[in-house]
Design a protein with these regions (language model features):
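Acidic/histidine-rich catalytic neighborhood of metal-dependent amide-processing enzymes
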Residues: 103-178, 220, 225-233, 237-238
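Short glycine/serine- and small hydrophobic-enriched flexible loop segments
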Residues: 16, 117-124, 210-216
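Phosphate/diphosphate-binding glycine-rich loops and adjacent basic-rich segments that engage nucleotide
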Residues: 116, 161-197, 201-211
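A short glycine/serine-rich beta->alpha loop
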Residues: 98-107, 192-197, 234
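N-terminal capping segment at the start of a domain
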Residues: 2-28
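Active-site metal-coordination/substrate-binding segment of hydrolases
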Residues: 31, 37, 56-57, 64, ...
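Acidic-enriched catalytic cores of C-N bond-cleaving enzymes acting on peptides and small amides
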Residues: 197-231, 237-239
Length: 245
């Protein structure tokens, strides 16, 4: 009966969270709901003010639950893709939870948020021995990780992290995935018309050569080494734009 009541509790928590507006850069109400639960569990946390740099209204929430041994990090994001305003979650008779049909449900990533909060609750209620748990709830993840981009990662002591933000079978996890690499290149050259004097300073031919070189796997490996993290870039997905000035 205890496990059954815990299952119902986490479902009710998920239902509660998915009924809260959480558009990117408008996560204030969601952040307040999460912080209220952390207060209830007496788990200390801080919320940064990086939203001032991004035009949002809520920051990244970082919490710690003390334990023994090496720390580990649990992470999820507070926002959902649009439309995520005016949400209303519906718990159907068959046990499924859906949106009302006019907005997204927001399971991405409120399922992860609910799982982390319920994990913290169970650890405390059952007095289960555990490692130190660091928790990071980021904002504006759906806008190419704007929130986490400004987070002060020096606060994190964990070398092991689980980001609860993927679909799949229970008990499975992803350990790598493609990523997006954007860079801007400025090329200074001589004024020249490609139709009359291509041999002098044709930018098109130079851009074509640059694109060809950049698409080679060896260069991608160099780019990957200069990046933080281990996500491999997608080979050949490079575009170049130029303008005559």
């Amino acid at each position: 009966m205890k496990e059954k009541s815990e299952e119902k509790r986490v479902a009710e928590l998920f239902l509660h969270l998915t009924g809260i507006d959480n558009a990117s850069l408008k996560e204030r109400e969601m952040a307040d709901a999460v912080e209220a639960i952390l207060d209830e569990l007496e788990i200390p946390y801080t919320e940064d003010d990086t939203w001032k740099k991004t035009g949002g209204n809520a920051g990244n929430i970082f919490a710690k639950l003390e334990g023994e041994g090496e720390p580990m990090l649990l992470c999820a994001h507070l926002d959902s893709v649009a439309p995520a305003l005016g949400k209303k979650a519906v718990w159907k008779e068959d046990g499924t939870i859906t949106s009302s049909g006019d907005t997204v449900l927001g399971a991405d990533d409120l399922a992860g948020v609910a799982e982390i909060l319920e994990t913290l609750r169970r650890l405390k209620e059952r007095n289960i021995p555990h490692r130190p748990i660091e928790v990071l709830f980021t904002y504006a993840e759906e806008l190419y990780d704007v929130g986490s981009e400004f987070f002060d990662f020096s606060q994190i002591g964990s070398k092991e992290a689980y980001v609860l933000d993927a679909s799949g079978c229970t008990g499975t996890f992803l350990y790598k995935a493609p990523t997006i690499v954007s860079f801007e290149v400025q090329i200074r050259g001589l004024a020249s018309h490609a139709g009359f004097q291509p041999e002098k300073a044709s930018m098109r031919s130079r851009l074509r050569r640059m694109r060809s070189e950049a698409s080679r796997w060896d260069m991608w490996r160099k780019i990957r080494r200069s990046m933080s993290g281990r996500s491999p870039a997608v080979r050949g997905r490079i575009s170049c734009r130029s303008a005559a000035r």
